[in-house]
Amino acid sequence: MNRPPRLLLNLARPWGEADPTTLAERAVGLGFHGVGLADSSRLMPDCWVESERVLAGTSAALAGPVVASLGVRHPATVAGALRTLEDHHPGRVFAVVGRGESSVHNEGLPVPSLRSHTDHLRTLRDRLLDGDGTHRLPGRLLGAASGPRTITATADALGGVLLDVGTELGTVRRAVALARADHPDTQVWLFVRALVVNDPRDAAPAAAPLLGSCAARMVAAPAWFGLDEEQLSLARQVAVRHDYLQHGVAHATTDVDDEGARLVRDRFLLVAPDGEVTRRTSSLTGLGIDGLVVAGGLPAVVPGLPALAAALRAGVAHAVPTEESR
């Protein structure tokens, strides 16, 4: 890794709640390199239109859709939109694509199989190659992945992965190694649900809206996340509370702080006092992470952004990657 990991704030704010350009400029002023725009047409403004607004109207070094749903949008249209944005804002377009489980679910469509999704990734990659084989978004196109098969397939198809595997150090280490097992130059970013709280007792209510979607990932690959039978049962209890119609926003999960909620929170979220956020960020980025995409869906993220930005920047600055991590 030749430079410190980059920091992007993912803007996942419901219709009418906040202007993405205003939030983007604020995030950049606090030290983020740019922003991602969530793709959920029933809940949030269109990520492509807002990406253009942010790129044209702010000083963000990087901006674009995170995560664009290939389960709803055809890869050919996604490629066309990315090429257009890149033509207007060369070197600044950043994009993450995925199956888009929540948006697909909300539209009543089937979630693409891994084979179908991998074909879509390859189509997207091919559509973004110039005639001489040059990629239009070198190092700036990633595929979201949580489980081991998806991580491997995405690294092979795109050469870039946004890991959504939580914050447990052992799991992240395995995921980074897997992403680079066949392609050592794979760009590896980590999706982090983080928030600074002054009192550890505030962690439970602050984290509640995102627990259900995290639990669903754990349930889908229990061995990968190191769950025993009892832990799997607890994770299932949390997963069924998740409301996909409110995915990524406040009240997506009922505010219940039980053993299952604590398990998911400890494995998947980084909601803690600033010193703890800094320490754990340093450990995570020291594994060879190229960048962090910070979830913006928690209600307290925006008002708490200055403290969060400071803690993350301190953690990234103190990351000391080893040769083995890259």
Annotate each predicted stretch with a short phrase.
Residues 1-62, 66, 325:
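N-terminal beta1-alpha1-beta2 module of alpha/beta enzyme domains
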Residues 2, 24-29, 51-62, 82-93, ...:
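Acidic (Asp/Glu)-rich catalytic clusters
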Residues 2-3, 45-68, 72, 117-130, ...:
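Alpha-helix-loop-beta-strand connector modules within alpha/beta enzyme cores
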Residues 5-11, 35-37, 62-68, 93-97, ...:
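Hydrophobic faces of well-ordered beta-strands that scaffold small-molecule active sites
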Residues 15-27, 77-81, 144-153, 206-211, ...:
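Short, acidic/polar
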Residues 43-53, 114-115, 165-182, 300-306:
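Active-site-adjacent beta->alpha loops and helix N-cap segments on the catalytic face
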Residues 108-132, 181-283, 320-325:
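An alpha-helical appendage that flanks or caps ligand/catalytic pockets
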